[in-house]
Curated annotation (Swiss-Prot):
Localization in the cell: Cytoplasm
A GO molecular function held by the record: nuclease activity
Regions annotated as coiled coil: none
Gene Ontology, cellular component aspect: cytosol
Species this protein is from: Rubrobacter xylanophilus (strain DSM 9941 / JCM 11954 / NBRC 16129 / PRD-1)
Biological role: Could be a nuclease involved in processing of the 5'-end of pre-16S rRNA.
GO BP annotation list: rRNA 5'-end processing
Matches recorded under InterPro entries: RNaseH-like_sf, YqgF, YqgF/RNaseH-like_dom, YqgF/RNaseH-like_dom_sf
Protein name according to UniProt: Putative pre-16S rRNA nuclease
Family per similarity comment: Belongs to the YqgF nuclease family.
EC number: 3.1.-.-
SUPFAM superfamilies per record: Ribonuclease H-like (SSF53098)
Annotated keywords: Cytoplasm, Hydrolase, Nuclease, Ribosome biogenesis
């Protein structure tokens, strides 16, 4: 299967908030884009497909430290099934995102506690996307 055309987006799906990142047109660099309410995600994806030219979406799957699919990963998989049904023109890719949020939140621990979570979600999505791009994902 040939890779889809356009940019790649990444989602760090949460219960309430979802971090969003997007690649550049050459699929070389990831940039944090925004944090949105998870309930508003279908509208955000429509906008990304239309305005950013996104053809592929990377979705972080929060496996356990043992690499197993736990409760959170099952919840993400359920949401991913709904997104796939609503966006048949987009290729969705699951990505093991273990510890991504912890890695990016370390430098932010010194900052204010309130609001930190929102900043971390889109940074986690960007880190995940950058790893994917560097490993040749979507190429």
């Amino acid at each position: 299967m040939s890779p889809p055309e356009g940019r790649v987006a990444a989602l760090d799906l949460g219960e309430v908030w979802t971090g969003v990142a997007v690649s550049d047109p050459t699929r070389t660099l990831a940039r944090p884009l925004e944090v949105v309410r998870t309930s508003e995600l279908p509208g955000v994806l429509r906008r990304l497909v239309r305005e950013e030219g996104v053809g592929e979406v990377l979705v972080g799957l929060p496996r356990t430290l043992r690499g197993e699919v736990g409760f959170q990963a099952r919840r993400v998989s359920d949401r991913l099934s709904s997104l796939r049904a609503g966006f048949p023109e987009v290729r969705f890719v699951e990505w093991d995102e273990r510890l991504t949020t912890k890695v990016v939140s370390g430098p932010l621990r010194e900052g204010r506690r309130r609001g930190r979570r929102e900043r971390v979600d889109h940074l986690a999505a960007a880190r995940m996307l950058q790893e994917y791009l560097e490993l040749g994902g979507g190429a």
